[in-house]
C-alpha cells in the first residue's frame, strides 16, 4: 500500500487485460488478419499477445458475454492513419450519434479526456473484435 496516496495499487508494475473468446481460432484469425498481431505464447484455452510494452490475453470462455463499453484500447500517434489501415483490413468502426458524443467517419473528438496526462482531449475510435469485445484506439490531443 502506498502510504502517501492510500492507493493499494500505486506500486503495481502493470495491469492484466483478459478478453473472453467463445472461439479461440476465430479470435486468432481476427487479431492476425485484421490487427496484424500474432500470439507470443499459447496455452490450452488461451493466447497471449504483446503490443509494445503491453500484454493482453484471450481466454476460452463459454459463458462470458461481450462488453458494451471499451474493454481494451491502444494509444496511437495518428488515429486517422490507424483507422484507415484497419478499415482496409476489414475492421468496421462504431458510429455513434448521442447528445455530446458523436463520431464522424468512425472517429470522435472528446474534449477534456485525460487532462492528467497533459492532453486537452482525445480523438478516439471503437470497433469490436470477432468475439464482440469492444476495443478502442485513442490519440491524445495536446
State the predicted function of each range.
Residues 1-25, 55, 69-72, 138-142:
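N-terminal beta-strand motif that seeds the catalytic metal site of vicinal oxygen chelate
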Residues 5-6, 26, 33-37, 111-115:
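Intrinsically disordered, low-complexity segments enriched in polar/charged residues with Gly/Pro
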Residues 11, 66, 118-119:
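Short, flexible hinge/linker loops that cap or flank conserved catalytic cores
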Residues 11-12, 18-56, 61-63, 81, ...:
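Core segments of cupin and vicinal oxygen chelate
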Residues 15, 44-45, 70, 123:
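Residue-level marker for the onset of beta-strands and adjacent loop->beta junctions
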Residues 23-25, 72-134, 139-142:
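Vicinal oxygen chelate
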Residues 61-65, 141-142:
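A short, sequence-level motif marking secondary-structure junctions
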Amino acid at each position: 500500500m502506498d502510504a502517501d496516496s492510500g492507493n493499494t495499487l500505486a506500486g503495481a508494475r502493470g495491469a492484466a487485460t483478459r478478453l473472453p473468446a467463445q472461439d479461440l481460432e476465430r479470435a486468432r484469425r481476427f487479431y492476425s488478419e485484421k490487427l496484424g498481431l500474432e500470439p507470443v505464447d499459447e496455452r490450452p484455452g488461451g493466447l497471449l499477445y504483446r503490443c509494445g510494452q503491453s500484454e493482453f490475453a484471450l481466454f476460452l470462455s463459454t459463458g462470458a458475454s461481450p462488453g458494451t463499453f471499451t474493454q481494451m484500447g491502444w494509444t496511437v500517434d495518428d488515429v486517422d492513419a490507424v483507422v484507415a489501415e484497419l478499415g482496409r483490413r476489414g475492421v468496421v468502426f462504431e458510429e455513434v450519434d448521442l447528445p455530446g458524443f458523436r463520431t464522424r467517419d468512425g472517429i470522435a473528438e472528446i474534449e477534456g479526456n485525460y487532462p492528467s496526462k497533459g492532453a486537452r482531449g482525445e480523438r478516439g475510435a471503437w470497433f469490436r473484435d470477432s468475439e464482440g469485445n469492444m476495443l478502442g484506439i485513442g490519440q491524445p490531443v495536446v
